[in-house]
Swiss-Prot record:
SUPFAM superfamilies: Ribosomal protein L20
Top-level taxonomy: Bacteria, Bacillati, Cyanobacteriota, Cyanophyceae, Synechococcales
Gene3D superfamilies from the UniProt entry: 6.10.160.10, Ribosomal protein L20 (1.10.1900.20)
Species annotation: Parasynechococcus marenigrum (strain WH8102)
GO annotation terms (biological process): ribosomal large subunit assembly; translation
Family indicated by similarity: Belongs to the bacterial ribosomal protein bL20 family.
TM region(s), chain numbering: none
Gene Ontology CC: ribonucleoprotein complex; ribosome
Entry-linked PANTHER family: 39S RIBOSOMAL PROTEIN L20
Keyword Ribosomal protein: yes
Keywords recorded for this protein, A-Z: Ribonucleoprotein, Ribosomal protein, RNA-binding, rRNA-binding
GO molecular function: rRNA binding; structural constituent of ribosome
Physiological role: Binds directly to 23S ribosomal RNA and is necessary for the in vitro assembly process of the 50S ribosomal subunit. It is not involved in the protein synthesizing functions of that subunit.
Protein's name in the database: Large ribosomal subunit protein bL20
Amino acid sequence: MARVKRGNVARKRRNKILRLARGFRGGNGTQFRTANQRVMKALCNAYRDRRRRKRDFRRLWIARINAAARINGVSYSRLMGGLKKADVRLNRKMLAQLAVVDPGSFSNVVATAKG
């Protein structure tokens, strides 16, 4: 069987991790063993939070729409039900943006939902 020499493999593997750990504080960014643990943790957090971000933004949009809807005298659930009945195809992100940037237009949308 042929002899296998590792060459640069180990250094490349370590440098890949240390590149990912650049900017971490202290030994977490310079020492391979701690950097490896921190990078694995960071990647787990990133994976989890990419999914959490979607939930958080949806909650934010709903809170903004609800606040603006109540100013116009209707609850969030009645507003969304009315919009569905009126076949208004605005998603929550668009409604929240409308409520913040242009309250007058949002009032017109609420009037449409009220029927």
